[in-house]
């Protein structure tokens, strides 16, 4: 089986739990001989727990992780139609560059798939100015012959345009923005926005007749995603939230995360080696400007970032734990109409306790009712066939008015 360098994730025990040095903010130029090819280089790349190597050897190592993730599981059929999601982050540019490199190799080494790129414009939803169109056009030219498309988050899939025809929409009447404003907590807004983004990407893939979608999540992102899913009550689907393959999307569209085995340091080094220019800084996601304690997602992200800085192997342990969780793949169980997660088939004591607490809170001055009546009402709510999972039902409960869908 193809190895992807698992020793670099600090899974070898207590020795890797020791803090050798903080992750570098950039590349330190240190000329010398490459430990791999023994060629003298003016710039060596020293990853944690690896010997220093030249630019060519580092790029070969990083690209091998990308190819090994897809090749080991054999989940990408030959000549598959692939949609790469570009969000302007460093990770998405690395994924774009790696896929383009794999597409331009000779026949023997070439990754045989037909790729398209879609840039999801999220700046209007976040209250920021849209990305410079010139930067997107430069990417389109640099990574020809990929077809580049642009769609705004919250817009209809039919509004998608090619990059050469795109101009930012001047219509301020965005239904998604209005719905986000109706949600009381930032936690619910971020969760709802994430699900809407995933559903939009699925619809775009169907419009372009793509069977597979590439997302640029790396190991630290997936560790954060795993803990966040559990905190939000999405534990039943947490395995698919961090897996290489997520098959919950409608229309038989499969979501792949081929960068799942890369870490932040490798992304930084790759960006420098290829002289890539991210469109946005890391951490510019929706709601991050409100601080670490403003939502469960922000708090979890800050917690994992602190672990990554001081105890990098712990993040690897969290991420690897997610790999070992078995996904619930019972085809007979219904799925949530919003997030496509498997619905709970039985009423658990935990869900009943949560719903009972919500019922008591909403009863207010009507607490003269007997405990039996309140418990019965809580059970009735759980048995309500609204097609929503527990986490999506919590978002629905926060809406001041209207329906989640």
Curated annotation (Swiss-Prot):
Source organism per UniProt: Drosophila sechellia (Fruit fly)
Any one of the GO CC terms: cytosol
Alphabetized GO MF terms: nucleotidyltransferase activity; sulfurtransferase activity; tRNA binding
Compartments, record wording: Cytoplasm
Pfam families with a match to the protein in the record: CTU2 (PF10288)
A GO BP entry: tRNA wobble position uridine thiolation
Top-rank taxon, per record: Eukaryota
Name of the protein described by the UniProt record: Cytoplasmic tRNA 2-thiolation protein 2
HAMAP family per record: CTU2
